[in-house]
Amino acid sequence: MQKATGATALQPSHMLSVAVLISGYTFAVCYFRLFIFPHIPVLPGGDQLGFATQGARIISGQLPYRDYFQIVPPGTDLVYAFLLRAFGVWTWIPGLVMACLAATVAVLVTLVSGHVMQGSDVALPGLLIAGFVLFSSLDATHHWFSTVLAMAAMMVLLDGNSNRHLAGAGALCGLAACFTQTKGALVLAAFVAYIIWQSRQTQVPGESWRKCLLLCAAAATIFGLANAYFVFAAGIRQWLYCVIVFPLLYYPGPGLNNWRVVGQELAADGPIWRWIPFPLLYAIPLVYVVFFLHLRNNRKRDPTQNWDKLLLIALTGTAMFLAVASSPSVKRLSTVSPPAMILLIWLLGRFGRTAAKLKIVLGVGAIAVAVAGSIRAQTRSWSFLDLPAGRTAFKDVAEYDEYRWVLGHTHPGQFFFGMPLYFPFRMRDPAAIEGLDSSEYTRPEQVAALVQALEEHQVPLLILGVSKKYPLDTTSPRLAPFRDYLFQKYRLIKTFATGNECWARIGSWQIGSSVNRDYDQLSRATP
């Protein structure tokens, strides 16, 4: 263990206590940023709304790949479906899920740190996650679910490589792949590399193949069992297209899904404090490079370090990073950062007093950022609406006005097209897709199916996103059928301050109807 620091190793019971404390702290930080005390949720946003909406589609009898489009395995959809079935469709669900995911990551990170660090250092990676990593990544999507499972699998291998440990780690990799297929597969590959490396150190090369086979068999079994029903329902060809072919060929089309996202985020408008997590997150690959160089130069010179466990952490983290390397947005980097935070603190303890002081600065800074963010969320001005999915807090006035208008002009259960309004208003998407894009991400057959669904269900209202997200004026031929249908069957009735446009179906929308009069009364009664 890390004797050079002069710190003492924590007893297992003390280690667990520290992990629970860091977890509780992380949960509180997230809760006070995502809820207005005591229990009013801030309007959820981001990709989590898509998964929550798909969970609602499952409990209504629909299935991914067959009835709606999905490019990842169904793990996240199923979690939301279970929660919505148990508690109902409420806007507090995504926020509470995110707080629980963050708390779980904090526990795992702290316990992993206890394998390779001593003293107060074991708490620092968890503090970095609560302060810097979660700063702009409170989005409960498949990325966080698969990270929790990948970290849990790594924990199992850190405790040993017996058949029981290998089967458990493999099963968790298979489960991680049920949320993010690339992360689960790459982490499994990292474990295989680790086992082969270990066997070469122990001079038992033949044993490694048996262990690798057990590991991979456990992963494949869990993944196969979890996905079999959906493969059967949609057909193997459709499942392969959605989960493998589409992500490889068409997912990188939008700038958000490729390397251009880095430039977009750096050039985006926003408050200066949005830059706080950028240096730490963009340094993730550098952390791994420095560690591997340090490993090569010092492994034989310093036998006091547990290099096997450190290598496993580094290989796992590198695999997780590679899963998002083609589209390294801040949110995605945040979800794969936990192993890097552990190695960063460990490395800082190896490079002299100045680096050791930097650990203190990072820890204090992380606490300050986390606490300040929570206080800011609780003390700023909020607007509130009683949406069909529950009372919800709004920080953006333009967004509040748009949602208030929609509240007065729609009703739960109606067909409607336009993310992200399905979930908070409990409305139904008539199509297999949730939106359109000018890139190759939107396929011609999806556009044709959307037009058919709008006509079949006579959808009364569409809310189309701002121009940078919704390419209404594009010359892309794949969107021409929708554009022609829109201009023929709908008319623009309102442009919101957000830039979003509301289109009403000609003949099915009467200005001055009862729902409009109800909204007018609501507008006068609501400050």
Q: Where are the regions that the model predicts?
A:
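Extracytoplasmic catalytic/substrate-binding loops of multi-pass membrane glycan-assembly enzymes
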Residues: 38-54, 65-79, 89, 234, ...
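Short acidic/glycine- and proline-prone juxtamembrane loop motifs at membrane-interface regions
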Residues: 137-147
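Hydrophobic/aromatic-rich transmembrane helices and adjacent perimembrane loops
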Residues: 185, 319-321, 325-356
